[in-house]
Amino acid sequence: MSEEMNGETFAFQAEIAQLMSLIINTFYSNKEIFLRELISNSSDALDKIRYQALTEPAELETGKELYIKITPNKADKTLTIMDTGIGMTKADLVNNLGTIAKSGTKAFMEALQAGADISMIGQFGVGFYSAFLVADKVVVASKHNDDDCYQWESSAGGSFIIRQVNDPELTRGTKITLYIKEDQTDYLEERRIKEIVKKHSQFIGYPIKLTVEKERDKEVSDDEAEEEKKDEDKEKKEGEIEDVGEDEEEDKKDKDKKKKKIKEKYHEDEELNKTKPIWTRNPDDISNEEYAEFYKSLSNDWEDHLAVKHFSVEGQLEFRALLFVPQRAPFDLFENKKTKNAIKLYVRRVFIMENCDELMPEYLNFIKGVVDSEDLPLNISREMLQQSKILKVIRKNLVKKCLELFDEIAEDKDNFKKFYEQFSKNIKLGIHEDSTNRKKLSEFLRFYTSASSEEMTSLKDYVSRMKENQKQIYFITGESREAVASSAFVERVKRRGFEVIYMTDPIDEYCVQQLKEYDGKKLVSVTKEGLELPESEEEKKKFEEDKVKFENLCKVMKDILEKKVEKVAVSNRLVSSPCCIVTSEYGWSANMERIMKAQALRDSSTMGYMAAKKHLEINPDHSVIKALRERVEADKNDKTVKDLVVLLFETALLSSGFSLEDPQLHASRIYRMIKLGLDITEDEEEEAIASVSGEKDECVPNLVGAEEDASRMEEVD
C-alpha cells in the first residue's frame, strides 16, 4: 500500500494522551455531553466560514448551505456529525487534534482529578476528546478551501493517523465518524439524539439536521400480478388502446385486486432546532428553563446561570442584548492570554465575531451573552470596530445594564454572597479602572470589619453605623483577617469605639488607591501618617505634653537609625505596643510593598520612589519606651541604647507587616538578648563554641557593652 493509503502516524502530545486515558478509563455518568461539544465545534467552524465570506464571498462557492448534519447508522454502529464549516487543513488536523496541547488541557485534568464534572470539558477548549466517552475509534475527515481532503483517525492508543482521502460528500467542512462502543449504542437511537440536541443545542444558530428513518405505505403487486403487468404493458406498447369503456373499468378492478400494501423504509433529514434566536423574542414569553438552556449552549457551562438581563435599545441606534452572570468564575479569568470576554456580536441576526473586546471593559470579562445590532455594517472588521462610534454607545449601554443587573442580584442576600465570592476581584478592578462608574461600583463592595467579623458589610452600612464625631472611614490592609485584627495599628481606633474595615485581598490595595472617599467621607488608612482621631481637649493637651517630654528620645533614636527611617515621632494610635512603623500618606503601605516584591515581572525602578518612607512612632505610655527615655536622660552615651533601639525598630518592622533586610542579624540580636536573660557570659559561649568547632565564633556581632550592662538590661524588661 502507498503512504497515502497507509497514512502518516503521529504521537499524541503527552498531556493529550493523559487526558484521553483519563476520559476512556474513568466512569462518567453524563456521557451525552460529547454530542453538545461536537455540535458546538461545528457551530464555531460555521461561524468562521460565514465571517470569512462577508469579505470573500467566493469562499462559499464550495457550498452555500450552512448546516450541521447528524447521521446514525445502527448496522455499522457509527454516528456521524458533519458540518459545512470552514474545515481543517492537514496541518490543522495534526496540530489541533493531537500534537499541540491547549492551555486548558492540564487545568482540566487537574479539575477532573479534583472531582470536577466531565461536562466542564468545553470550558477548557478540549471538547473534541469527549468523543472517546462513547466511541472506541474516531475518524475525522475534513476539507478546507486551501487544501485537499484529509482524514484523521485514532483509537486513542497514544497515536493517530493522517491520510489523504476523496470524499465526494465533503466539498468543504468536517465529518466526524464515531465508532460507538458496544455498551453505548443508545446514542444511535433517534429519540436519544433528539433529546440531547433539545437539551443542549437547540439554540445553535445553524440548522441541525438529523437523518431519520421513516416508513410509508407502498402498493406493490404480487408475483403473478407483476408478471401479468409486464405482459400487459408489453401488449399495450405493441398496439393502440381503442376502447375506453366498461372493459377498461373491469381491467382496473382486476388490477386493484392483485395489488397489496407494504411498509417501505426511507431516510430523510429532519431539522431539530427550528426555534428562532432567543434574544429576538419578547422576554415575557421566555421561561427560565429556556434562558438556562440557551446560556449552557452559549457558554459550554454545565450549571445554570446566576442572573440574566434581556433588553433592547431603540432610538438613535437599535440593538438587542442578552447578558448572563455565571454561577462561578472560569479557571483562567485573569490570565493574560485569555480572550477578553465572552460576548458574541451579531449584526441583523448574522454572526460577526465572538469575544468582541470592544463590547465590554476588561473587568466585566466574566459576563457572557450576545449583542445583535441593527446599525453596524455586516462586513465590519476588528479594526473598524475599534473606531466605531456606534460600538462605543453600545458598550456604554451594556456596562450600565450590567450594573443594573448587579443591583438586582444584590436584592437577594444569598445570591449576592455567591456572586461576590466569585467576582469581587472584578468589581475592585472596575473601581481601579472605570472612573465613570467608580461611585456606583463602590456600592457593591463588601468587607469584614472590626464590628462585623462574621459577615461582610457594605460601605453604606459602615457609614450608617459611624459615630457622631467620626468624620472618616478607617481601614487597614494586610495579609489576613487574623493579622489585621491583632495589628498594633487598630488598637486605639478600636479602643475609641470606631469601626475599622479589614482589607485582605491583594487587589484591595489597588482599589483603595482610586477610591478616595465614599458618601463624602474620606477613606483613611490606619497604617499611614496623618491619622486623626477625634480627641477631647484633655487628650490633645496630654499629646502635646508627651511630644515635648519625648522629643529628646525621638532625636536620639533618629540619630541611631539614621536613613532607616524618615522620622521618629510620638504616636496617638498605640495602646499595648511600644512602637510601630507607619508610612507616608502617598507611598506604599507595608502590605503593598509585600505585594510588589512578590511580582516576578515588577519594575524595579518603581521600588525606589514608591517603597514606603518609614516613620517610627513610639507609644509614650508604654513601660519600655518610658524606661528607654529614662536611660537616655540619665546617660546619652549608654552603650546598650543603640542595640535596644535597633531591636525595637526591627521588631516594629515585623509587627507592622514589613520584611527585614537582614533577618540573620536580627536573629543574632534576639539570641544575644536570650543569653543575657539567662546570665550566659561571652566567655562561656566562646568556650562552648571552641569545644565543638575548635574556633572562636566571629560571625555574630557583639552587643555593645553587653556584659557590663546585663544587670541594667533587666530593668528595661
From Swiss-Prot:
Superkingdom of this protein's organism: Eukaryota
Gene Ontology cellular component list: cytoplasm
InterPro entries: HATPase_C_sf (IPR036890), Heat_shock_protein_90_CS (IPR019805), HSP90_C (IPR037196), Hsp90_fam (IPR001404), Hsp90_N (IPR020575), Ribosomal_Su5_D2-typ_SF (IPR020568)
Motif TPR repeat-binding positions after renumbering to this chain: 713-717
SMART domains (alphabetical): HATPase_c (SM00387)
Basic and acidic residues: compositionally biased ranges: 227-239
GO molecular function annotation: ATP binding; ATP hydrolysis activity; ATP-dependent protein folding chaperone; unfolded protein binding
Binding locations of ATP: 41, 83, 102, 128, 382
Ranges for region Disordered: 215-263, 690-717
Keywords: ATP-binding, Chaperone, Cytoplasm, Nucleotide-binding, Stress response
Residue ranges, compositional bias (Acidic residues): 240-251
Subcellular location per the Swiss-Prot or TrEMBL entry: Cytoplasm
Family classification: Belongs to the heat shock protein 90 family.
Function: Molecular chaperone that promotes the maturation, structural maintenance and proper regulation of specific target proteins involved for instance in cell cycle control and signal transduction. Undergoes a functional cycle that is linked to its ATPase activity. This cycle probably induces conformational changes in the client proteins, thereby causing their activation. Interacts dynamically with various co-chaperones that modulate its substrate recognition, ATPase cycle and chaperone function.
Comment on protein domains: The TPR repeat-binding motif mediates interaction with TPR repeat-containing proteins.
NCBIfam families xrefs: PRK05218.1 (NF003555)
HAMAP family (UniProt xref): HSP90 (MF_00505)
Subunit: Homodimer.
Name the record gives this protein: Heat shock protein 90
Provenance organism: Brugia pahangi (Filarial nematode worm)
Organismal lineage: Eukaryota, Metazoa, Ecdysozoa, Nematoda, Chromadorea
